Amino acid sequence: RDNTKKVPGHDAEYKKGLNRTNYSIFLEHTYEDRNITASAGVAAVKNTGNSDGFKFYPGVNASWRFLGNWKLYAAYNSSLRMPTFTELYYSVGGHAADKNLKAEKMQSVEGGLRFSRPWVNAVVTLFYNHGSDMIDWTKDLSEGADAPWRSRNYTKINTFGQEVSARIDFVSMLVRDDFFIRNIELSYSHINQDKKLEENIQSRYALEYLRHKFVVKADFHIWNGLCANASWRWQDRVGNYELFENKVSTCNMVSYKPYSLLDARLSWTSGY
């Protein structure tokens, strides 16, 4: 009891605690020419919650601007994420944490092409992420309806993705402040992972992701200070959920279905 600590504002005491310290050293160098920008760096990281010594995480970024409006870019980065105290010790309310979780490691490669002018901006991006010891909360329904959510490490998860987006500013293109459509934006992204969901296993984070996402946005000038904007998106998520009937679990998993959502807003600006 001598080691307990009062909870501020409550008639309660902390009975367990943990301290950890993070040490980071960064070194980076940047080179800039008229059309070329490049930078390389490394981070040395040590956390007292990890038995390892200092680990080094390099990163490289480069871009090349050509033909005035085009830019080609590429990047490589690596990183570390320590498990949170919740992931390590939260074992109440249907959760069972693992105090022996390892830190997440991530390596990512990204490349893309951008075209930009005052009235248009378009980007194509490709990326690849290699994650090891990725942390997730999972639930195994083969253990029954009362199965707990357990924190765990996944050995490896490889993620591949593509993104395409374009934005057109009609006010700048037509040099007309009163044009009905002020701007329009289109974007599409696709992600695929090589780690598949196991049978009867429900994932809360690592294995649930948006495989497809398509978005259309537009801003409109209606009359004087009256404007509107609208956004429509269609999403297809990978993952599943636990089916309940009459507030009781059926211990069955149901895959998410694609859905779409439309948002719209009117606004008025006085003194237009």
What spans do the regions from the language model cover?
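Transmembrane beta-strands of outer-membrane beta-barrel pores
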Residues: 2-4, 33-35, 42-48, 76-82, ...
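Hydrophobic, lipid-facing positions within transmembrane beta-strands of outer-membrane proteins
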Residues: 21-27, 42-44, 56-60, 97, ...
